[in-house]
Amino acid sequence: MRLNTIKPGMGSTKPRRRVGRGIGSGLGKTCGRGHKGQKSRAGGFHKIGFEGGQMPLQRRLPKRGFVVYGKKQIQEIKLSSLLLIDRNEFDTSVLHEFNLIKSINYPVKIIADAQACTRAIRLKDLRVTRGVKDIVEHAGGQVELTIEDVNGI
Protein backbone atom coordinates (compact mmCIF):
# COMPACT_ATOMS: atom_id res chain seq x y z
CA MET A 1 0.00 0.00 0.00
CA ARG A 2 1.25 3.49 -0.89
CA LEU A 3 -0.10 6.94 -0.14
CA ASN A 4 -1.06 7.53 -3.77
CA THR A 5 -3.17 4.35 -3.89
CA ILE A 6 -5.31 5.06 -0.81
CA LYS A 7 -8.96 5.84 -1.64
CA PRO A 8 -11.88 6.73 0.62
CA GLY A 9 -14.27 3.91 1.54
CA MET A 10 -17.20 3.07 -0.74
CA GLY A 11 -20.14 5.40 -0.16
CA SER A 12 -18.22 7.70 2.21
CA THR A 13 -17.98 10.55 -0.34
CA LYS A 14 -20.47 11.98 -2.82
CA PRO A 15 -19.55 13.46 -6.21
CA ARG A 16 -19.87 17.25 -6.26
CA ARG A 17 -22.98 18.80 -7.81
CA ARG A 18 -22.34 19.98 -11.40
CA VAL A 19 -25.08 22.38 -12.38
CA GLY A 20 -26.01 23.94 -15.71
CA ARG A 21 -24.77 21.06 -17.87
CA GLY A 22 -27.88 20.05 -19.79
CA ILE A 23 -31.38 18.81 -18.95
CA GLY A 24 -30.27 15.18 -18.86
CA SER A 25 -28.24 15.81 -15.72
CA GLY A 26 -31.33 16.88 -13.76
CA LEU A 27 -29.59 20.12 -12.79
CA GLY A 28 -29.56 21.94 -16.14
CA LYS A 29 -31.17 25.24 -17.17
CA THR A 30 -32.34 26.61 -13.78
CA CYS A 31 -29.66 24.64 -11.91
CA GLY A 32 -31.98 23.43 -9.15
CA ARG A 33 -33.04 26.97 -8.18
CA GLY A 34 -36.57 26.84 -9.58
CA HIS A 35 -38.16 29.69 -11.60
CA LYS A 36 -37.97 33.39 -10.71
CA GLY A 37 -37.91 34.92 -7.27
CA GLN A 38 -35.18 36.40 -5.12
CA LYS A 39 -33.52 33.09 -4.30
CA SER A 40 -33.10 32.20 -7.97
CA ARG A 41 -31.15 35.37 -8.78
CA ALA A 42 -27.42 35.86 -8.51
CA GLY A 43 -26.78 37.44 -5.13
CA GLY A 44 -30.36 36.65 -4.07
CA PHE A 45 -29.78 36.74 -0.35
CA HIS A 46 -31.71 38.01 2.64
CA LYS A 47 -30.29 38.43 6.09
CA ILE A 48 -30.79 35.69 8.65
CA GLY A 49 -33.94 36.28 10.66
CA PHE A 50 -35.61 38.40 7.94
CA GLU A 51 -39.29 37.48 7.69
CA GLY A 52 -40.36 39.48 4.64
CA GLY A 53 -41.09 42.70 6.49
CA GLN A 54 -42.92 41.06 9.39
CA MET A 55 -41.43 41.93 12.76
CA PRO A 56 -38.74 39.25 13.29
CA LEU A 57 -39.03 36.81 16.16
CA GLN A 58 -35.91 38.08 17.96
CA ARG A 59 -37.47 41.58 18.06
CA ARG A 60 -40.94 40.39 19.08
CA LEU A 61 -39.67 38.68 22.23
CA PRO A 62 -38.90 40.86 25.27
CA LYS A 63 -35.38 41.42 26.51
CA ARG A 64 -34.45 39.49 29.62
CA GLY A 65 -31.77 39.89 32.26
CA PHE A 66 -28.66 42.01 32.25
CA VAL A 67 -24.89 41.68 32.28
CA VAL A 68 -22.97 42.63 35.40
CA TYR A 69 -20.01 44.73 34.25
CA GLY A 70 -16.92 44.67 36.44
CA LYS A 71 -17.85 41.32 37.97
CA LYS A 72 -15.01 39.80 39.95
CA GLN A 73 -13.82 36.48 38.60
CA ILE A 74 -12.70 34.62 41.70
CA GLN A 75 -10.65 31.49 41.06
CA GLU A 76 -11.57 28.84 43.62
CA ILE A 77 -9.16 26.10 44.67
CA LYS A 78 -9.87 23.21 47.03
CA LEU A 79 -7.64 22.81 50.06
CA SER A 80 -7.00 19.15 49.18
CA SER A 81 -5.39 20.15 45.85
CA LEU A 82 -2.93 22.36 47.78
CA LEU A 83 -1.97 19.45 50.02
CA LEU A 84 -0.94 17.40 46.97
CA ILE A 85 1.87 19.89 46.28
CA ASP A 86 5.09 19.34 48.23
CA ARG A 87 5.40 22.92 49.47
CA ASN A 88 4.67 24.60 52.77
CA GLU A 89 4.24 28.18 51.55
CA PHE A 90 1.61 29.17 49.00
CA ASP A 91 0.87 32.37 47.12
CA THR A 92 -0.50 33.20 43.66
CA SER A 93 2.84 32.70 41.91
CA VAL A 94 3.21 29.17 43.34
CA LEU A 95 -0.36 28.26 42.34
CA HIS A 96 0.25 29.58 38.81
CA GLU A 97 3.51 27.63 38.60
CA PHE A 98 1.65 24.37 39.36
CA ASN A 99 -1.22 25.27 36.94
CA LEU A 100 -3.86 25.46 39.66
CA ILE A 101 -4.95 28.92 38.50
CA LYS A 102 -5.18 30.37 35.01
CA SER A 103 -4.15 33.93 35.77
CA ILE A 104 -2.42 35.76 38.61
CA ASN A 105 -4.47 38.88 37.82
CA TYR A 106 -7.73 37.54 39.26
CA PRO A 107 -8.24 36.95 42.99
CA VAL A 108 -7.86 33.41 44.36
CA LYS A 109 -9.94 31.87 47.12
CA ILE A 110 -9.19 28.62 48.93
CA ILE A 111 -12.29 26.60 49.82
CA ALA A 112 -12.61 23.69 52.22
CA ASP A 113 -13.51 20.15 51.26
CA ALA A 114 -13.82 16.86 53.14
CA GLN A 115 -10.07 16.27 53.54
CA ALA A 116 -8.42 17.67 56.68
CA CYS A 117 -5.07 19.46 56.66
CA THR A 118 -2.34 17.09 57.85
CA ARG A 119 0.65 19.45 57.83
CA ALA A 120 1.34 23.06 58.71
CA ILE A 121 1.07 25.28 55.63
CA ARG A 122 1.35 29.02 55.18
CA LEU A 123 -1.11 30.84 52.90
CA LYS A 124 0.12 34.27 51.85
CA ASP A 125 -2.20 36.85 50.24
CA LEU A 126 -4.84 34.25 49.40
CA ARG A 127 -8.47 34.69 50.34
CA VAL A 128 -9.83 31.79 52.39
CA THR A 129 -13.15 30.68 53.83
CA ARG A 130 -13.69 30.52 57.59
CA GLY A 131 -13.56 26.74 57.45
CA VAL A 132 -10.19 26.72 55.70
CA LYS A 133 -8.78 29.24 58.16
CA ASP A 134 -9.85 27.06 61.10
CA ILE A 135 -8.47 23.87 59.47
CA VAL A 136 -5.09 25.44 58.60
CA GLU A 137 -4.61 27.09 61.99
CA HIS A 138 -5.65 23.89 63.80
CA ALA A 139 -2.88 22.02 61.90
CA GLY A 140 -0.31 24.63 63.02
CA GLY A 141 -0.25 26.70 59.83
CA GLN A 142 -1.05 30.35 59.31
CA VAL A 143 -3.06 32.54 56.96
CA GLU A 144 -1.53 35.93 56.09
CA LEU A 145 -3.57 38.61 54.37
CA THR A 146 -1.68 41.81 53.67
CA ILE A 147 -4.35 43.13 51.29
CA GLU A 148 -7.81 43.53 52.78
CA ASP A 149 -10.69 43.57 50.32
CA VAL A 150 -13.50 46.06 50.82
CA ASN A 151 -16.18 43.43 50.21
CA GLY A 152 -14.46 40.84 52.40
CA ILE A 153 -14.00 38.41 49.53
UniProtKB/Swiss-Prot annotation:
Protein name, per record: Large ribosomal subunit protein uL15
Classification lineage: Bacteria, Pseudomonadati, Pseudomonadota, Betaproteobacteria, Nitrosomonadales
GO CC term (a single one): cytosolic large ribosomal subunit
Region Disordered, residue ranges: 1-42
Gene3D superfamilies given in the database record: 3.100.10.10
Protein's GO biological process: translation
UniProt keyword annotations, A-Z: Ribonucleoprotein, Ribosomal protein, RNA-binding, rRNA-binding
rRNA-binding is among the record's keywords: yes
Family indicated by similarity: Belongs to the universal ribosomal protein uL15 family.
Naturally occurring in which organism (per UniProt): Nitrosomonas eutropha (strain DSM 101675 / C91 / Nm57)
Function, as annotated: Binds to the 23S rRNA.
Gene Ontology terms, MF aspect: rRNA binding; structural constituent of ribosome
Summary of subunit composition and partner proteins: Part of the 50S ribosomal subunit.
Top-level taxon of the source organism: Bacteria
Compositionally biased intervals (Gly residues): 21-31
The keyword Ribonucleoprotein belongs to this UniProt entry's keyword annotation: yes
InterPro entries per UniProt: Ribosomal_uL15, Ribosomal_uL15/eL18_sf, Ribosomal_uL15_bac-type
